[in-house]
Design a protein with these regions (language model features):
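Thiamine diphosphate
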Residues: 1-152
């Protein structure tokens, strides 16, 4: 019996049914899967991932940067924030991009990541974004890695 050919690129190849990934890589793949689900539903969406590189989830940015060749052709963009507050504000803006029907995309799905103190800092943005909601074909996943002593 011949062994199956496996490459490092398999983790982001949606035609592969069995892959081995880390948790961070699973989040990257999740964005590719969301884009494909939207495409099959007749939607032209984009992805926007942002957060604070100093968070306990700091390895997440590294995975998104490494996967740029798979993400960019699928209109999925990673842009680190200067801090959690600015990243959250930018992501909130992505949910308003097609508010009046003038956007380039039908919607933008997004991920925000930060640490506990950054969640505190970003309370205003979270509150207002929660009241405003997401775009019809968008959505946001907020991830927080705890850092009780704010040392990361």
């Amino acid at each position: 019996m011949a062994l199956k050919k496996v490459t490092l690129a398999d983790k982001y190849d949606l035609t592969q049914d069995r892959i081995f990934v880390t948790g961070y890589q699973a989040l990257v793949r999740m964005c590719l899967v969301q884009k494909e689900r939207d495409r099959r539903a007749g939607l032209n969406t984009a992805g926007y991932i942002t957060g604070y590189r100093g968070s306990p989830l700091g390895g997440l940015d590294y995975q998104f940067q490494r996967a740029e060749s798979a993400l960019k052709p699928n209109d999925i963009f990673f842009q680190p924030g200067l801090n959690e507050d600015l990243a959250a504000t930018a992501l909130w803006g992505s949910q308003q991009a097609e508010l009046r029907g003038e956007g380039k995309f039908d919607g933008v799905f997004g991920i925000w990541y930060g640490k506990g103190p950054g969640v505190d800092r970003s309370g205003d943005v979270f509150r207002h974004a929660n009241f405003a909601g997401t775009s019809k074909h968008g959505g946001v996943l907020a991830l927080m890695g705890e850092d009780h002593t704010a040392e990361s």
